[in-house]
């Protein structure tokens, strides 16, 4: 574990000691090396925990998420270069330091063995994200978005802390490895139902569940590009990761407590997909599509069968790369036409034919078309939902149709049509941007060849 965390820590002095011209190059190239080093975690012969120390361990569920975190840091740095070049050198270095500290905290969160340690790190990721949104956001509403983000997360987290302390007193340990072997089960009572709610609510808000999702579109729309990327790709996955981990403890209760939440998430999936159809803001559309994809993950984690866990883990990784790619594309549009409104960006296919190809590929991946891993994740989830209740196939069908509709709407409004008159003096696509899109897309397609790497705990 130290071979990832220590080099990541050393990126901080590297950032501050590099000369202004070399800062971005140095940090990006070294963070790429770290992300390649993290791939060695995939060499696990079985599905047991791989202990690094008493504090840190990795297993088939946390490994793909750790690698995704390490993979996204260089991509975020590549995406942010253009948008930060007006800032002075100290601010640029501070921004890079925030991203690096966020990566370190996230890697430690995913590899923590103690639930209290996980909780502390889970909350600590809030601070750099909040600073990134409220300091480097584009519009003046960024403070409002930051406050929404902070309070939604904190309101969910306080009951979780109380619940974890209760479990510690009750069971005597919060170590995940020991908990998975304890035969301690919770009996059905009002207090235990409340304990279940307290444990799950923090993660459901983070996911986010439909109804407590209002912070997400706000935070996404106001965040700078790196903020949007890390929020969509990894911070939402903290919620689903926490839910899978804590479901060991709450075992028999989930069977009947999950019903309202599965129904709410399936209903929310259709509602948020429908909301996408009437968005005018490109980033907002991508944010709402994230909510509808994560609703599927919530439903599949709540069903608690091996297939549904596999589908949830696959869709988590697939959605992380896809939504991050879509935000990068939206940002490349924003840097040229200085507006997120979709109607202002008509006919871009005429000017940037290669970018239009990336738009098409990203939308098809978002639609879960083969050969992307989104398809596998959604197939696993659809099958496990269908075996849970036949009725869900109707909701899934409606959702697939609406997803197709908003993906078409997104492509047709931004890429097709007649060029608007205000588009003059547009910069061509940079190699940096095209490399960035490729580095998102290549893992998505290549993982199809060996999906067992990301199927999580049930290899």
From Swiss-Prot:
Q: How does the protein's chain sit in the membrane according to the entry?
A: Multi-pass membrane protein
Its annotated compartments are: Mitochondrion inner membrane
One GO term (biological process): response to ethanol
What GO molecular function annotation could you give as one example from this UniProt entry?
NADH dehydrogenase (ubiquinone) activity
| Similarity annotation | Belongs to the complex I subunit 4 family.
Subunit details: Core subunit of respiratory chain NADH dehydrogenase (Complex I) which is composed of 45 different subunits.
The record's function comment reads:
Core subunit of the mitochondrial membrane respiratory chain NADH dehydrogenase (Complex I) which catalyzes electron transfer from NADH through the respiratory chain, using ubiquinone as an electron acceptor. Essential for the catalytic activity and assembly of complex I.
Name of protein: NADH-ubiquinone oxidoreductase chain 4
Question: Which gene carries the instructions for this protein?
Answer: Mtnd4
